Each structure stands twice: as C-alpha cells, then as structure tokens.
C-alpha cells in the first residue's frame, strides 16, 4: 500500500509538472523571433537572441538564451516576461516600524526606516507562491526578534505562476532588479558594502538569490555577504553550470539546505548536487521524518481536498528546508543543532563518522548560525569546495535532536548460543539518573533485523537530550512473520541475550557503557533499565 501511494504520488507529480508546461512550446518558438518591445517608458530593439529590460531610463539587464542558458540539460529556455507584468515588490520590515513597500524607481533612504549599517536580510519565495506566505513572515519576524536588522521581502508573485519554464526565466529579471536595489543601498553602507547582506531563498527563490549575487558582481563589482539556498529547485538547474544556477561563487558565503534532493523523476523537487561552501543534508537530504504518509492520508488530513492533499504530499520534504532553517535562527540551549562532516549519509548513520574531532573541525552548527564557526575554523581550507554536513532531525517541531552512537554487543554465552539468534528491534531510552526516575528521552529505534550470538551492531540515532547520561533503558520487540517459520516461537519465549551496550552522546561529549543486571536476557516487550555498575557481573 505504501509503495502504491508513493508511486501514485510520483505519477501525479509528473502530471502536474507537465500541465505546468502548457504554453511553453509556443513561447519557446516566439523567443527566437525579432523583437520590438516597449517596457515601461523606454523602447528597445532586441536581436533574436537577446532582450533588454528597462524602466524610466534604467536598464536592469540584457538576457540571451545562448549556452549555458540553453544546453543538453536545459533544452527549453525562455526570456523573462515584460517587466510591467512581473515587476516585483520589496516590502521592508524593521523593528518598531510598519512594513512598507520600497519603490525602486524613486528610492530615497531618508523616506524609509532602513538603517544601512545594520544587517540586511532578503527573503524570497519559490514557484506559485507570494511574499505574503506564512513561512516568509515567520522568518522575518524571528529575524527581527533575534537582532536589530532590516528585512526585505522580495515578492515576485506576479511572475511565479505557471508554466514552470516561464517562472524559471522570470527569476533572471527579478534577480537583476533586486541587485540594482541593493546597489543603491550600498551607496549608504560605507566600507561594509554588502558584506552584511544575507539573501535567503526557497526553491526557485534560491536560484533567484544567485542571480542577485552574479549581477552585483558583474555590473557593480560588489559581492554580497551571504546566500542561503533552501532546497534549491532541481528542474532546469540540475547538471548545469553557473551562472544558470546558484553556486558558491555567487556570494562570500553560500550555504544550502537539501531536504528533497531525490531525482525529479522519483518525486524530488530539490537539487542533488553540492553547490555551496556548506551543503547540509538533513536525514540524507531526501525522505524527511514526518513526511512518509501516503498520498491518500494527506488527502484525508486535508478534509478530503484532492488538490490540497496532493500538494502537501508532494511538497512535505521540500518545505522542510525553510522549517528547519527557521528553527535554527533562535539558539536553543537545550539543543545545539550540530551537524557532522561525512562522505555519505550511510556512513554517518552507521557510526563511521561520529565525533567532532580534537578541534571540533568535523562539526558545524546547522543553518543560520553556521557561518561564524565556518569562517573561524574552516574557511581557508574549504573555501573552494563544498563541505558536506549531515544530521538527523525529529518528525515534528522542534526538529532539533541530539545524536547518539550506540554499539550493541550480543552475548556469546552458552545460553545465548543455545537459544540462537533473534529477529527484531531494540528501542533505547536515555536516562539522566541511575534509578530511571529523572529526566529521560523518548524511545528511539535501533537496528532492525537478525541479531546473532556474539554479533556487534553499531548505528547513530537521534532523540531528545538529557543533561547527564547515567542509564539506558532497553526494550526488545520481536518481529514474527506468519509466512516465515524461522520466526515462529512456539515452545520458547522470544528473547535476546546482551553482553554490553555503549552509548556516546555527540553534543554533550559523554559516553556510557551499561550491561543487563545478572546477565538477564531481554524478553519481548519487557523494558529493562541498565546501568554501568551491572557490568561487574560479566
């Protein structure tokens, strides 16, 4: 049933994408014709491969469709629509002032509440969204609570609608226009230039931020301080070269959060490639916890609405990127949001990359607070390549969890050998006291499968934190199958004999080794509290 739901969702995903291409073919044919266009108050004549966009005597940019904008990996490439149609709005928010629309044509710093010497954040949306969407307002509000800053919301909703290929083209123009606004602001920032500017974009908005950065560099010789890409869109951007897509060269620091990076044909909306100075892959960057329900369950949760249910099903992984980022803005003393560098997520979850190293060079804070640590400890070494970081999150808010590496050694005693191996799963609860009456975590599942006598099993799990790791509670859950006689236990009680368990806490840098009391086996469904002093019986 789960497989069917997933396949049905992928099929619908493909259908929706194809429907969004309606009209793209005709636009593509026309885009190679000879143009005479009126944009704003100015007239321009374009060649068959270039269009220029201007208003009130200000040219925002001239765009062509030559390589790399059209390539084997991007066979369809369009011009942006008319400026008068897609003209973006810029909504400025500062502490103590009501949101106001910033007019680019007659920008006057004295008529706004913008303080050019304070941090400047730009936040923008993706395909089929607008600047008034809840997640953008949540990020803006949280940034303003966290520090005295300027937040500029880029609303390009007039150009973000279908077909998708046209929205892809429109962000080139929106990025160029936004770069001109930032250039005007930079006239008031002095030596800071735009080092204190940070552009944050989701999906198509992430690549839009890249176009802001490239335009600032090419036209004004200014490099923006930071760009954060929240699951940058994959369709039309995968396997293409900069400046077609966002890249670490677009800003002094580029960090990417990948949450839906499966290939598009498999249902993924986000780009797979590592394209930033730091690329975070929560939960491996694909299937996010809490997003595993079938499409029909989402329709049911949406009160039977097919459209809303399918939309939530298709976008759950994709929107996790801005949900994680929002949570990372406000430091939580109870959860540090630590990430670990590792060659692959499989290596990370199997425990091969656990630990931060002597100088903590393997770890980075996740999301918003990662830049300072990166530049202090890693900047020179990793400046020209991508730093790949992994973490495991929870299913629900708060998403931040602490990581534990667990090593389980199954007993090789005679009793264990006589009983033989068992098929099932161990569940761990970390305790802050040896009597089990104090602070404890929620249970978390360990390796599921066959556990043989003398076997050694290691994995990384994530759950809540405890102030001090003092004891571990284990529960064995036996897996039986009606169709597999080897799992039947008719004359014997399902149980497993353990020798010892070692648990290491990444964030708190604690380690504990516990054992079952008097070598007592773990019976199916019966929790057992284990503490270090019980290891004296072995």
Task: List each language-model region with its residue ranges.
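Flexible, membrane-associating and regulatory peripheral segments of lipid-active enzymes
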Residues: 2-153, 159-170, 180-194, 220-222, ...
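Histidine/cysteine- and/or acidic
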Residues: 171-280, 292-293
């Amino acid at each position: 049933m789960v497989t069917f739901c997933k396949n049905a969702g992928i099929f619908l995903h493909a259908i929706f994408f194809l429907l969004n291409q309606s009209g793209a073919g005709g636009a593509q044919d026309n885009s190679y014709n000879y143009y005479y266009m009126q944009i704003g108050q100015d007239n321009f004549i374009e060649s068959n491969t270039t269009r220029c966009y201007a208003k009130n005597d200000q040219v925002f940019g001239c765009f062509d469709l030559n390589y790399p904008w059209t390539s084997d990996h991007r066979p369809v490439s369009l011009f942006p629509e008319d400026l008068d149609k897609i003209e973006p709005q810029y909504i400025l928010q500062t502490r103590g002032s009501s949101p106001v629309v910033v007019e680019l044509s007659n920008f006057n710093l004295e008529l706004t509440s913008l303080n050019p010497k304070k941090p400047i954040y730009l936040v923008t949306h993706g395909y089929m969204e607008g600047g008034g969407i809840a997640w953008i307002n949540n990020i803006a509000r949280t940034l303003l609570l966290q520090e005295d800053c300027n937040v500029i919301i880029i609303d390009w909703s007039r150009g973000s609608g279908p077909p998708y290929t046209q929205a892809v083209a429109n962000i080139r123009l929106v990025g160029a226009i936004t770069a001109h606004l930032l250039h005007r602001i930079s006239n008031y920032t002095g030596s800071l230039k735009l080092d204190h500017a940070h552009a944050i974009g989701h999906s198509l908005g992430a690549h839009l931020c890249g176009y802001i950065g490239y335009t600032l560099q090419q036209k004004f010789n200014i490099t923006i301080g930071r760009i954060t890409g929240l699951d940058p869109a994959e369709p039309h951007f995968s396997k293409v070269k900069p400046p077609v897509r966002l890249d670490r060269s677009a800003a002094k620091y580029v960090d990417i959060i990948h949450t839906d990076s499966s290939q598009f044909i498999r249902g993924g909306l986000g780009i797979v490639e590592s394209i930033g100075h730091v690329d975070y892959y929560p939960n491996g960057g694909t299937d996010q916890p809490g997003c595993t329900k079938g499409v029909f369950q989402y329709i049911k949760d949406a009160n039977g609405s097919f459209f809303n249910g399918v939309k939530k099903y298709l976008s759950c992984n994709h929107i996790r990127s801005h949900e994680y980022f929002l949570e990372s803005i406000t430091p939580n003393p109870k959860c540090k949001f630590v990430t670990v560098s590792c060659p692959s997520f499989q290596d990370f979850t199997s425990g091969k990359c656990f630990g931060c190293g002597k100088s903590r060079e393997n770890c980075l804070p996740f999301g918003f607070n990662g830049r300072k640590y990166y530049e202090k400890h890693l900047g020179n070494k990793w400046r020209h390549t991508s730093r790949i970081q992994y973490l495991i999150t929870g299913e629900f808010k708060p998403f931040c969890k602490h990581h534990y590496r667990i090593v389980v050694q199954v007993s090789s005693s005679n009793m264990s050998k006589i009983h033989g191996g068992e098929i099932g799963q161990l569940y761990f609860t970390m305790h802050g006291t040896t009597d089990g009456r104090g602070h404890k975590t929620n249970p978390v599942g360990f390796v599921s499968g066959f556990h043989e006598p003398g076997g050694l099993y290691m994995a990384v799990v994530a759950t809540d934190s405890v102030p001090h790791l003092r004891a571990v509670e284990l529960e064995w859950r036996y897996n039986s199958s009606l169709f597999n006689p080897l799992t039947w236990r008719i004359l014997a009680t399902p149980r497993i004999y353990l020798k010892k368990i070692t648990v290491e806490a990444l964030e708190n840098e604690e380690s504990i080794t516990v054992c079952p009391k008097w070598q007592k086996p773990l019976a199916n469904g019966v929790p057992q509290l284990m503490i270090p002093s019980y290891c004296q019986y072995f």
